From Swiss-Prot:
Pathway the protein contributes to: Lipid metabolism; fatty acid biosynthesis; Lipid metabolism; sphingolipid metabolism
Lumenal face of the membrane: 107-124, 181-189, 263-264
Database matches in PROSITE patterns: S5A_REDUCTASE (PS50244)
Broadest EC class assigned to this enzyme: oxidoreductase
Name this polypeptide is given: Very-long-chain enoyl-CoA reductase
Gene behind the chain: TECR
Function: Involved in both the production of very long-chain fatty acids for sphingolipid synthesis and the degradation of the sphingosine moiety in sphingolipids through the sphingosine 1-phosphate metabolic pathway. Catalyzes the last of the four reactions of the long-chain fatty acids elongation cycle. This endoplasmic reticulum-bound enzymatic process, allows the addition of 2 carbons to the chain of long- and very long-chain fatty acids/VLCFAs per cycle.
Family indicated by similarity: Belongs to the steroid 5-alpha reductase family.
Localization per record: Endoplasmic reticulum membrane
Amino acid sequence: MKHYEVEILDAKTREKLCFLDKVEPHATIAEIKNLFTKTHPQWYPARQSLRLDPKGKSLKDEDVLQKLPVGTTATLYFRDLGAQISWVTVFLTEYAGPLFIYLLFYFRVPFIYGHKYDFTSSRHTVVHLACICHSFHYIKRLLETLFVHRFSHGTMPLRNIFKNCTYYWGFAAWMAYYINHPLYTPPTYGAQQVKLALAIFVICQLGNFSIHMALRDLRPAGSKTRKIPYPTKNPFTWLFLLVSCPNYTYEVGSWIGFAIMTQCLPVALFSLVGFTQMTIWAKGKHRSYLKEFRDYPPLRMPIIPFLL
């Protein structure tokens, strides 16, 4: 059985960083990364991007050496992705923050609204209902991160945790300040508006959870398998008939419901920014589905049925 020789060059300087002799033909890129780490321990596998061309796409960890368009002496180019952190850690951090930050404003801890309001309670029912909904949303997200989601990528750049936390924590503080303010004004149409908004919120939260469970069942634990998601017997998953990412559709719907319930401008802005970002993600995933699966359902749109 022939063996391969693998040289790894710096993608920027073309400097030879490592030479691997007698590499098995069936070795994966993940195994080559581990061998590279032995000579350069500062670059652990998650930091490494190996590619066939200095400006090309990163090879997948599961790619097999003998199936790549290389000879028995293969040249790979290395790029440092920077310090990495696990997706689970990032999600837990960015979701735990809003949960606790919101509660600080809800309980009106000292130095927020003035001494005479310390630890007082709002007289408006919608304020307490909003706290329950907000807390439920982020507790749900935390539990899904721990027990439901299966991540195709193990890590992301460390800098992302600061960007994500600034976004989630900042908006949580902004909306919580106004919703729990002693001078907060309840919704214009009173109980009817709150009940309608609560119904929207609850339905969308159930829908979002149902989609996450359906997506989880598509991917076996520990794998990166991708399949076309289809509706199940659960009615909340029937939205798969019309959109590629109904989890985002339901998520946006939840925040629209919360915005109607609280009639709070920061919540509306958070919903708008979230919708914009999720639309970008949904379009990317939709394109990926179309590219990977020739039999992908043609009627589906990325996030909004028939429109977007």
